[in-house]
Amino acid sequence: MDYTLTRIDPNGENDRYPLQKQEIVTDPLEQEVNKNVFMGKLNDMVNWGRKNSIWPYNFGLSCCYVEMVTSFTAVHDVARFGAEVLRASPRQADLMVVAGTCFTKMAPVIQRLYDQMLEPKWVISMGACANSGGMYDIYSVVQGVDKFIPVDVYIPGCPPRPEAYMQALMLLQESIAKERRPLSWVVGDQGVYRANMQSERERKRGERIAVTNLRTPDEI
């Protein structure tokens, strides 16, 4: 690197530091308005706040919960997505993550906790057992939590990795940003519009079937 003691002219044509250029402001009031005033729709601002401050309910059922908690460590840092504030009460949470096997005796408890959550609220089904019962096709295991509560995002895997949980959070944030719901109390039908999100399986189908790198049977 070449060093020089020549002073850089911030207003010169051959300026190497464009961020240091001094702008000539004709109207200081207009400059302050541009810096401090944001024009947009109220629904978009509310959804922006909701999707970036999701409070998950601290509730786990099985080994998938261990992977969920792993995402809160410094290696993954789920705080980047604003979902690191675990709540111990369903009345203070807006996201329930059903992580693990849902037994028949546990279904009424999950249903009651879900009913205690305030609107708006969302549900993530984490793991094969929560999605469809997994390997436990028996009388004591519910074959999917969507049998008694609505589910917004499904995470496949047994158990899924923490990266899959964070991807589910990003998909949920994308869905929340497109939601439309009343901003005040409404008697009767709330008129909530939820975006019809395409499944990851269908979205990546073209990439999945486009076989470009063929491996030999010995490498598979």
Curated annotation (Swiss-Prot):
Protein name: NADH-quinone oxidoreductase subunit B
Subunit structure and binding partners: NDH-1 is composed of 13 different subunits. Subunits NuoB, CD, E, F, and G constitute the peripheral sector of the complex.
Highest taxon, organism lineage: Bacteria
Free-text function comment from the UniProt entry: NDH-1 shuttles electrons from NADH, via FMN and iron-sulfur (Fe-S) centers, to quinones in the respiratory chain. The immediate electron acceptor for the enzyme in this species is believed to be ubiquinone. Couples the redox reaction to proton translocation (for every two electrons transferred, four hydrogen ions are translocated across the cytoplasmic membrane), and thus conserves the redox energy in a proton gradient.
Membrane topology: Peripheral membrane protein
Residues binding [4Fe-4S] cluster, per UniProt: C63, C64, C129, C158
Single GO biological process annotation from the record: electron transport coupled proton transport
PANTHER family: NADH DEHYDROGENASE (PTHR11995), NADH DEHYDROGENASE [UBIQUINONE] IRON-SULFUR PROTEIN 7, MITOCHONDRIAL (PTHR11995:SF14)
EC number: 7.1.1.-
Gene Ontology CC terms, in alphabetical order: plasma membrane; respiratory chain complex I
One annotated GO molecular function: iron ion binding
NCBIfam families, alphabetized: nuoB_fam, PRK06411.1
Locations listed in the record: Cell inner membrane
Family per record: Belongs to the complex I 20 kDa subunit family.
Keyword annotations of the record: 4Fe-4S, Cell inner membrane, Cell membrane, Iron, Iron-sulfur, Membrane, Metal-binding, NAD, Quinone, Translocase, Transport, Ubiquinone
Cofactor mode of binding and number, as noted: Binds 1 [4Fe-4S] cluster.
Pfam families given in the database record: Oxidored_q6
Cofactors: [4Fe-4S] cluster
